Amino acid sequence: MSSIIQLLPDHVANQIAAGEVVQRPASVVKELLENAVDAKATDIKLIIKDAGKSLVQVIDNGVGMTVTDARLCFARHATSKIRQAEDLFSLGTKGFRGEALASIAAIAHMEMKTKQEQDELGTHIVIEGSKFVSQEVAVLPKGTSFAVKNLFFNIPARRNFLKSDTVEFRHVMDEFQRVALAHPNIHFSFYHNGSELYNLPAAGYRQRIVGIMSGKTNEKLVPVNEDTEIISIQGFVCKPEFAKKNRGEQFFFVNDRFIKSGYLHHAVMAAYDGLLKDGSQPSYFLYLQVPPNTIDINIHPTKTEIKFDDEQALYAILRASIKHSLGQFNVAPVLDFDRDSNLDTPYHYKDVEAEVPTIQVDGTFNPFTDDKTNQHYTKAGSGSGSGYSSGSSSSSGSGSGSSYSGYSKRVEPTVSWESLYVGLDTENPETIESSPFIFENEEVTSSLFNDDEVEQASQKTYQIHKKYIVSPIKSGMVIVDQHRAHQRILYEQFLLNMTVNQASSQQLLFPLDLFYSSSEMKLIEELKPSLETTGFVFEEAQTDHVVISGIPVNITESEVSLVIEQLLSDLQDGIPASSYSQNDTIAKSMAKSLAVKTGSYLTEKEQDNLVNGLFACKDPNISPFQKPTFITMRVEDIDKKFAL
C-alpha cells in the first residue's frame, strides 16, 4: 500500500503560510515597512493603488542587498535578523521569522530592485506566484524597492473576501500610522492613487504625532516622562476634555514596536479615574522601553501582543506616571462636563432661603389724568419707604402712615374701575373650570380626531428604569426599548432623506470648524455627497479641517462633532459590511449617535411620540442593528405568572 502522507511543494506550502501572514493589503504594507526600517533607512516611501489591491510599493534608502541575498530573501525561513533561538530574547529588529517575503511572493506578482552603496550595479528580480520570472542587473539608486501587484491573483476566494476599498484603505492607513509613529526619526511619505496623503519629515515624537493626527492635536497633548530600572516611559496623553467615543487614537509602542495590551490600557483608564464622562476614551501615544530579555514577542502571528515578565509592576508605574502628569499640568477632576460654572450658587448664599418676590400694582394710577393728579398720587405714596412695598399692613411710622392715607383718598376711583368686572371675583374657581367655554372647546377638539386616534392618545405609557416604555394594548401590554426604538425611527428618517427626499438644513450663524487627521479627512471627502443629502452643508474643503455652515434640522449644533466622530469610528473599525451601501452605513451611524440613550428620562408626551413613531415605521420589530425593539406580553401570560 502506497504512503498517503507526502511533502507539499514549496509554492503550495508558501500559499498556505500566506494565509497566516498575509490577510489583506495592510499585512503586506506592515511587513514591507518593517523590513525598510530594519534596513536602517532614513527615507521610506509608500505607494498604493486601489487600497493596495492593485499595487503596494515600498521604496527605501536602506543598506540594500547583494545579489545572493536578493535571491535568498524569497526562500522560506531565510532571515538576517537571528542566527539561533536565543536571539529571540534579545531582538532589536521588527522581523525575524523569515516568512513574509516568501508568503507575499506566493500570492502576488512581485518585483524587487535593490543595490548596496558600494556596488556599481543593483539587482532586479521579478517573481509571480513563487516562480522566478527574471533576474538581471540594473542601474539603481542605493536602497531597496518592493512592488507587490495583483494581490491574491491565484487565490480568487481570498480576494473575494476582501472588504471595500474604503475599509481596506483604512487598514493600510492604520499600519502606516503605527510604523510612522514608532519611528519619528525617519522621513515617511505616503501616496494613494497618485495623491500625496502624508509627507512626514524626521522630527520628535510631538511633531510626528501632530503631523499624523492634525494641527489641533498639539494643544491636547500632556507629556508623560518616567524613567525606572525596569521601564522607561515617554509619550503623551490627551486632556480629558478631548476624550472621544472611540479608541482610534490609542497607541502603545514597546521597544519601537506597536502592540495591543488590554492590561496596559486598563492602567491608563485607571489613571483617568474620575476625569472622564461615561463611555469616553482618552487618546494616548505612549512609548515604552524595556530590556528585550524581559518580553516575549513571538506569541502572535502579527507580533502585536507581548508577554511581560512583571506586568503588575509595569501597570503600577504606568498608572502612577500618567496620574502624575495629569496633576502636574493642572488637569483637575471634573465630574460633570456639561455643567455651566456660571450657574453655581455663591458660597455665602447657599444657606439662605429664597424669598418669594412680591408684586404690587397701584390701582389708583390713571395714565389719562393730568400730571398734577399723578404727582399727587406719587407724593401721597412716598415717604420713608416705597409706596409699592407691602409694609405688612401693620408697619408704624410716618412713612407707612402717609402711604396708606394717600391710597385712602382715592378709594372711589379704584372701586369704579373694579366695577367693570363685577361678579368675576366672586365666582368659584371650580365654576370657571366647568364653564360652557371649556365644554365647547373640548367638543371642538375631539371632533378634530377620529375615534382610533382618541383611543390611542388615551392609553397611558410608563417609563421603567429610564430604559423601557410600557403601554397597555388590547391583548395585554407592550414593552418598548426606548434606545432601539429611537434608533429605528431615526434610521428610517435619515434613509428616506438620502434616497427619496432632500432633507431640510438649518444654517449656522457661526460655521463649525472641525479638525481631523489626513485619513479622516479623506473619509469625510468620500462621505460628503451622502452627508449633504441628510442636511449637512460643507464649505470649501481644507487640508486638515472641515467647515460646516449647515446641519440637519433634527441635530443640534453640539451634536455635530459627535455624529461625525461616530461615523468615522464605524468606518474605521470596519463595521459596515461590503453588502451595505454608504447611505445605509451613514443612516445607521447617525441613528446610533442621536438616539435617546438608556438612562434618559422621558416625559409622557415624549413616550407617546416614541411609541407612535416606532409603530409608524416600515419595520418596527427590529432596530437597524437587527435587535428587537419591543416585546408583547398577553394577559394570558400574566395570568400564568399568577397561576390563575
Swiss-Prot record:
Key words of the record: DNA damage, DNA repair
Stretches the record annotates as Disordered: 363-405
Domain of life: Bacteria
InterPro entries per the UniProt record, alphabetical: DNA_mismatch_repair_CS (IPR014762), DNA_mismatch_repair_MutL (IPR020667), DNA_mismatch_S5_2-like (IPR013507), HATPase_C_sf (IPR036890), MutL/Mlh/PMS (IPR002099), MutL/Mlh/Pms-like (IPR038973), MutL_C (IPR014790), MutL_C_dimsub (IPR042120)
Keyword DNA damage part of the UniProt annotation: yes
Biased composition (Low complexity): 389-405
One GO-annotated biological process of the protein: mismatch repair
Pfam families, sorted: DNA_mis_repair, HATPase_c_3, MutL_C
MF terms (GO), sorted A to Z: ATP binding; ATP hydrolysis activity; ATP-dependent DNA damage sensor activity; mismatched DNA binding
GO cellular component: mismatch repair complex
Free-text function comment from the UniProt entry: This protein is involved in the repair of mismatches in DNA. It is required for dam-dependent methyl-directed DNA mismatch repair. May act as a 'molecular matchmaker', a protein that promotes the formation of a stable complex between two or more DNA-binding proteins in an ATP-dependent manner without itself being part of a final effector complex.
Entry's family note: Belongs to the DNA mismatch repair MutL/HexB family.
Protein's recorded name: DNA mismatch repair protein MutL
